[in-house]
Amino acid sequence: MSNEREILAIGALIHDIGKLVRRAELVDKNQKHTLAGSVFIADVDVDGKKIFAPYQKFVFKHHELDLDDSDPLTWYVCYADNIASSERQTTQDEGFEEKRTLENVLARIGKDEEGKINSYFKPVAAGEIDYATDKNTADRSDFRKLYDALVNDAKKLSLNVENLRFLLYKYLSFVPQSTQKQGIMDISLYDHLKVTAMIALSIYDYVETKGIKIEKYDDLKKLENEKVLLLVEGDVSGIQRFITNVSSKGALRSFRGRSVFIDLFQEIVVDRILQETGFFRTNVHFVGGGHFYLVISNTEQNIEKLKKIQKEINQWLLEKAKDLKLVIESEPMALSEVKDPSEVFQKINEKIRKAKLRMYSVDELNELFDLVNIRSVQNLQTCKICGKRTDKIFSLREDQEPLACDFCKQMYEYGRQVMHAKYFSQDPQGDFEILNERYSFVDEPLKTKNYVLGLRKIDPENSQNLVFIDIVNYAKYQEFEELAEESAGKKLACLQADVDSLGSIFREGLKTKTLSRISTLSRLLTYFFKHEVRKLAEGKNVAVVYSGGDDLFILGGWEDILQFCYEMQVEFRKFTGLNENVSYTASFVMFDEKENIGKVKEMANQAESLGKKCGKNCIVLSHGMKRVFKNHRSILEKSQIVSWKDFTEKTYKIYEKLSKLANSVDRSVIRKALEISLEDSPMNKAFLAYIEARENEQDRDFANLIRTQQIPALNAVLQLIDLKARRRDENG
């Protein structure tokens, strides 16, 4: 990778750093942000060396009027800055307002573009935001705190593109890009800087590869309507079958391990593409849930490299995990389309959809059949998990007979070792293999490439080869039996949730759909399903199987899962500015600790699908895994659908009140209430009135709550209360 590329990327990433300097009021208010950036360059002093000094030209000269002929690299940043800033909606002579906070783009989904919203994010570091507020200004001290932290960390870490990108993500994700008094301010400074670097690098590579002569700045402008960019989409198919294909022994570890593998696999695939095409993580638009988007240069060389990478990766998957298949497609994009790339996204989504219908080529099918035939005639053993023929099988646990091939054994170990690890590092002696490279989970980074698992403090002595990713790896316990031991009635539950109409949100939710704005929107959703979900899970009797992008799947004691359901919805509403146009549908399904995990996931899918069909923005409660069998499939027999509004305001509130009474109410009263919830007859109502006349105060209160309240999903609530009472009776 050429040194010029790294210089260009770093220059693009810091070109607007003066905007933070101005907001921290470290310069005179009349000083332009292009000059204010000199303060940052001077402050990041490492042993007398100002490490950003070689890049100051990008800070001082990224506006057309400031350009000269001495350094063509600044032209690329200037032009990319203009393209990335095409969403700015300003009026003439409106002036500046440095203290405005970042508007919540989630609160604007489906709303009048010109209308006022009342939802903003405080200017704090990533990881410190919990919800949006109605305060649209911040104090100078808020920005100064961010600035000081950024400068302090910049002095510690080795200066390279990925470290700088991460620092800007950490400290500028909730700082607005624009400093205008008027206009929409819902694009973060971080997203603007990243998209500027993305575009600048792509134009540079396009020009260099095609041998285009750029003798003056205006020559770059001539490329406006040319298909300079290439939108790349990747999709890992077969994930659901893959992650549920686990042994009943150690099922939770294997289930989580396979999910962790997908998280790491997608990141390693992205890095493989970036490495072979010569780009950085600045060119990653989105990655999560086995899906990714990149923006690189539209060259024949890159298109051929993508085909080669896809073929090589699928050959590896065919050997190791035949349930999985990687589909990669690309679509050219003009620089003028950055203002609204929605049509380009639609085209590439359709390409992916069609590609997934023809999962294997003739050559791949022949290779698969040859592999099966070779193994069938050899003296091999069969993996009892994936069915692969192999020369050796392993035990997952000491108390278990051998049953797993090397790959399935690794999936189990992923779930075990990820619990407390800080890094996933390339290691020739490592236990894990992905794409013919070996890796280890470690507490300290190695001298090779290290994937940093989440937001954490980095040792400056080991900051050379870091890639920052985020995996929600919380689990109180690693076995179903341990989770069940702390749960009433030893019953477990799962929560599955998925954002409603995500495609429509990106296609139609915003009138102005620039790349920077879409980037901010997708990053905020990912932020919630990573950082906020992690905070809500910590301390609870749960295990996060996966969470990120726009969905999650969590298992645990049913009481903790139910509490998590309530808290997550409350926090999601606050995070999205109470916008009814942004919602998710969830399923809450109870099961026994011995239940097959594949069946649990199937039930969760069916319950969630039911909620999607019945209006979305709801939770589907299913108690006890009651099933009928049809066409060899388990079908949910009884489910109760509750809107999130009813669940948070009524159902869960009544559940809390009844829970407090569960330890003292006669269980016969609870059982009678259960009958009433199924058949509201006059005789049953009379029985409740009789209970209210009893001397036992708790019985009276319980009966009164049931008789006088309109409770959505009452039967589901009462079954949960009956479980708590049953535990009380069993414990004496």
What residues fall within each predicted segment?
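Divalent metal-dependent catalytic cores for phosphoryl transfer on phosphate-bearing substrates
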Residues: 1-124, 174-179, 224, 244-250, ...
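Cyclic nucleotide signaling catalytic output domains
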Residues: 297, 308, 312, 588-592, ...
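Long, compositionally biased charged/polar accessory segments in the mid-to-C-terminal portions
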Residues: 614-732
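A short glycine-enriched loop-to-beta-strand structural element that forms part of the catalytic core
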Residues: 55-62, 230, 282-295, 322-340, ...
